[in-house]
Each structure stands twice: as C-alpha cells, then as structure tokens.
Amino acid sequence: NGGAHIDIGNSVGLVNGAPSETLETARFRGDREDLSGSLGFSQILGRDTVFSADFNYLHSTGFLENPHKLVLMGFANPATPPVFDYLFTTLFAMPENRPDTHNQSTLNTHLTQYFAAPDAALHLDYSYSRDDWGIKSQTVEVDWVQALDDGWTVTPRFRYYTQNEADFYQPYFIFREAYPQSPGNPGQLDYSQLPVDAWSSDQRLSGFGARSVGLIISRKFENNLKLEIGFEDY
C-alpha cells in the first residue's frame, strides 16, 4: 500500500490531491490492483456561501469479477425442429466474466448556502461518474438544515440517482445458435468460443434509477454527545 496527500491553500480557497495505490489478492481466483487519484478545491464565494469540487479517478486491473454471481446463458439452436414454435434451448449457468481493466472517473460538487433569517443552511450536491464499461451515473442530493431552539435541528432531504447499464450486462443471455463445444470433448461448452467477450447479470451493473426522501431530527448535548433520529422513504 502507498499514498500521498498534498494541500495547497489560502485564506479563501483550498486545493488538495491524494494519489494512492492498493494491491490485494482475491481469495481463490486471482489478483486485483487499484490505482486511484483525486484532486479537489473549496472556495468561499461570499460570507454565507461555500463551493467545493473534487475529481476522482480509479484504474483497476486483474480479477474484477464477483465470484458469487452466476450468469444464465441459453443457446437456441435454429437447426433443431421447433416445438410449438419454440426452439430447443440449452441452458448453462456460469460465473460472470468482466473485462480485466476498469477505468472510472467521478466529479463531485457541493454548494452550501446559509440563510440568516431562518437560521438554516441549504446543501446542494451533484455527482457525475462514467467508466469504460459503458456506465454513466448521476446523483443529486438536497438537504435543508433548519436550526431550532435548544440545539435541535430538523433536516428534510432528497436524493435522486440514475445510471445506465454496462455494455456487457444482461439479466440473462440468449443466443440463436448452437452452443460451441470443446474439440475432442463433445457436449462440453467451449468458453473460448462464446459469442460475447464479457458477461454479467450483477444488478449493480444494470440500468436503474432511484429516489429517496427523508427527515432527520437531531439535538446536540454537552461533551460532544448527539441524538439523531431519522427516516427515509426509498
């Protein structure tokens, strides 16, 4: 493991960077190496306004699969006679196979605006991420932190997230062809001749959107104690 951290600041702004590298061995299957770096800054825009942004990059190589995920593949052979207009389909359940490299870039922005009259602060967050697997995602978060008497605060919040699916994601794979068989071993699937190079049915790689609304009620006490109660509808 290795890493470094750099801070360059002045009275109204701050720039920071943090490259790092980790190496880990995935149990049973192979090695994975992650190389990451980040660069960010914060800027005071006014007496009651602060803006910050950071850019993060992650490069991963090696074993990137989830060893607990299986993928269902079906081969509908058009050469076989159909039964009730359906082709005979041979099914296989196999471990997922992801590309050996993954490059991901993420941009995060945050704006805090304080309002004196209601004694409240508005927090706006926006994040955009994309990678070379075809996934693009966006996140929007809005928090209104309202101060009350006796150290109480009430925070209504909203979050929205959306992403599209990876290039090699499908809930299942169906091919209109006979399944490739290993030479000299009839009946055994030849993985090297599959019609796709990578495949996964991991729902985290699927396209989806989600929104949540919530409320947090908190109170600060002496000795840095804090009580917090909240709920969220997802």
Where do the language-model regions lie?
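Transmembrane beta-strand segments that form the barrel wall of outer-membrane beta-barrel proteins
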Residues: 1-5, 120-130, 231-234
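Solenoidal tandem-repeat scaffolds enriched in leucines and small polar residues
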Residues: 4-78, 94-96
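Short helix/strand-bridging catalytic loops that position acidic/His residues to coordinate divalent metals
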Residues: 22-24, 139-143
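Residues on the lipid-exposed face of transmembrane beta-strands in outer-membrane beta-barrel proteins
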Residues: 37-43, 109-113, 126, 142-146, ...
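Outer-membrane beta-barrel channels and translocator barrels
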Residues: 44-48, 116-118, 149-151, 222-224
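A broad, low-specificity signal marking well-ordered, structured residues that form hydrophobic/aromatic
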Residues: 51, 122, 227
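Outer membrane beta-barrel transmembrane domains
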Residues: 54-112, 130-139, 151-234
